[in-house]
């Protein structure tokens, strides 16, 4: 199969010009999305709309936004092609699900941020989410988000990904 490549700047790049330069590289290589491109904290409608209008790579804004209203504003104003929800920071599963449903109503995908049991449950209940983020993962070190506090051998280590590239949603506590 074909691998989709995404880039998450995590609002690290200093300027819109820097973000545009990196975005052009994302375009050249056919990236699936370009996430939180520069240090606006993910809230500049004008800056992110400018990027969206000048790049072919879709922009994903939302990792640093904590409410569905701001995310929807970014989407309807053409600043973000996707939304991003996180049950740890966005009002739990209920608050995050509100953004998932709002995004679905707008016809866009809502990607779930980070990993954990709540993220898997939210993604499993969402029609418009594509990728489970097993973040900060490398074959030679453990995932700092895979906490040893869960029952039934729950894990977000590399072995949680099956041979087909899927991650199961647990049906136990």
Model-predicted segments: where are they?
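Short, well-ordered beta-to-alpha junction loops that form the rim of enzyme active sites
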Residues: 10, 114-115, 172
């Amino acid at each position: 199969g074909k691998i989709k490549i995404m880039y998450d700047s995590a609002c690290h790049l200093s300027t819109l010009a820097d973000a545009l330069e990196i975005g052009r590289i994302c375009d050249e290589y056919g990236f699936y999305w370009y996430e939180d491109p520069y240090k606006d904290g993910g809230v500049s409608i004008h800056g992110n709309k400018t990027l969206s209008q000048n790049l072919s790579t879709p922009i994903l804004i939302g990792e640093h936004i904590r409410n569905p209203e701001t995310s929807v504003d970014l989407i309807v104003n053409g600043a973000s092609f996707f939304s991003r929800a996180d049950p740890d920071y966005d009002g739990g599963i209920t608050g995050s699900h509100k953004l998932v449903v709002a995004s679905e109503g707008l016809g866009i995908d809502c990607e779930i941020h980070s990993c954990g049991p709540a993220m898997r449950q939210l993604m499993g209940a969402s029609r418009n989410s594509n990728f489970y983020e097993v973040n900060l993962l490398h074959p030679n070190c453990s995932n700092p988000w895979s906490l040893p506090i869960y029952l039934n051998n729950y894990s977000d280590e590399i072995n949680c990904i099956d041979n087909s590239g899927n991650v199961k949603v647990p049906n136990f506590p």
